[in-house]
UniProtKB/Swiss-Prot annotation:
It catalyses: sn-glycerol 3-phosphate + NAD(+) = dihydroxyacetone phosphate + NADH + H(+); sn-glycerol 3-phosphate + NADP(+) = dihydroxyacetone phosphate + NADPH + H(+). Belongs to the NAD-dependent glycerol-3-phosphate dehydrogenase family. It comes from the Bacteria. This is Glycerol-3-phosphate dehydrogenase [NAD(P)+]. Pathway: Membrane lipid metabolism; glycerophospholipid metabolism. GO terms for biological process: carbohydrate metabolic process; glycerol-3-phosphate biosynthetic process; glycerol-3-phosphate catabolic process; glycerophospholipid metabolic process; phospholipid biosynthetic process. The keyword NAD applies. It is an enzyme of class 1 (oxidoreductase). Its main location: cytoplasm. The active site is at K161 (proton acceptor). The keyword Nucleotide-binding applies.
Amino acid sequence: MRIAVIGAGKWGSALHLALKENHNCFISSLHQRDLEDFVSIKEALECEYLVFALSSQGMRAWLKENFINKGQKILIASKGIEDQSCQFLDEIFLDFVPKENFCVLSGPSFAAEVMQKLPTALMISGINQELCKKFASFFPDFIKTYIDNDVRGAEICGAYKNVLAIASGISDGLKLGNNARAALISRGLIEMHRFGKFFGTKEETFLGLSGAGDLFLTATSVLSRNYRVGLKLAQNQKLDSILAELNEVAEGVKTAYAIEKLAKMKGIYTPIVNEVVAIFKGKSVQEATQNLLKQND
């Protein structure tokens, strides 16, 4: 049995380190990297099990360019919604593999802590529960895994919390205090759940690891790149310069636009996401924050 992680960024590297503890695991990306167990894309696609840790915005293009369906079993470890199409990652993968052949990984998990082998709990979601159990069995003891079948709920939580983390970073950057941040996160959880209900998700997904757990982690720590984007926006830095300086992908930026478009199409009330997008477009963080503080629901 051979596993390959596709994507050699921080998260992909952390997953590779964890999975190689007990299994024959490789790592690959489009560009040659000086990493242990690095293999070419062609070699990686020969593995029976694939873990995708690519940027959500680049996933479709990568699959079109490189993927050859050989019956591989797939774990989607990326978190985001494609901005251009407003499609979730499972919808993108359905163009390439049957739904029985993939699962989604979610939950509170900073790459740095996984690489330190600190205790972590993750959720694996899929309609093929046997495949979920199989992927769960690959992880080492310091990573506790749970399984369920709420794929869309897990994806919405994983994507939405990144936008809320930006909002939380803005709040902290403006030094509005712990009370304001707690209010923002709790109202954000309600907003995220309200959005998710339109897609037939389960309430418990939003209250568990995929939802509340990942949100609380990502929205309260400088280890979160999305939270750091919010901190810098609060200092009146321009988004383009923030992202250039970050030199990493902050999934919450593109995802915010996608959520806003989906919410408008379906008539879903998403005030926090709307204000974050407005800030991206030039609205002052002070005005946007005041608008949120005045919201009644």
